[in-house]
Structure formats: C-alpha cells, structure tokens
Amino acid sequence: MLALKLSVYSVVFFFIAVFVFGFLASDPSRTPARKDLED
C-alpha cells in the first residue's frame, strides 16, 4: 500500500512540475526581466 501511495504521489508531482515548467517556458513575453538577464 505504501508503494502504491508513493507511486501516485510521484506521478502527481511529475505532472505538476511539467505543467509549471511548460507554463513558464511558453510565456517569455510576460517576463521581460528574464529576457534582459539573458542578454
């Protein structure tokens, strides 16, 4: 039962991380400060 719970938590955390990363990476126009730092 513990392994099942850990696997579910890991999958949920993975999807949340992918969603947050994709949201930040696909939205460079709303973060001009990061664009200035890259220069």
Swiss-Prot record:
UniProt GO BP: photosynthesis
Keyword vocabulary terms for this entry: Membrane, Photosynthesis, Photosystem II, Reaction center, Thylakoid, Transmembrane, Transmembrane helix
Keyword NADP: no
InterPro entries found in the cross-reference section: PSII_PsbI, PSII_PsbI_sf
Family, as annotated: Belongs to the PsbI family.
Assembly description: PSII is composed of 1 copy each of membrane proteins PsbA, PsbB, PsbC, PsbD, PsbE, PsbF, PsbH, PsbI, PsbJ, PsbK, PsbL, PsbM, PsbT, PsbX, PsbY, Psb30/Ycf12, peripheral proteins PsbO, CyanoQ (PsbQ), PsbU, PsbV and a large number of cofactors. It forms dimeric complexes.
Protein name (database record): Photosystem II reaction center protein I
Lineage, opening ranks: Bacteria, Bacillati, Cyanobacteriota, Cyanophyceae, Synechococcales
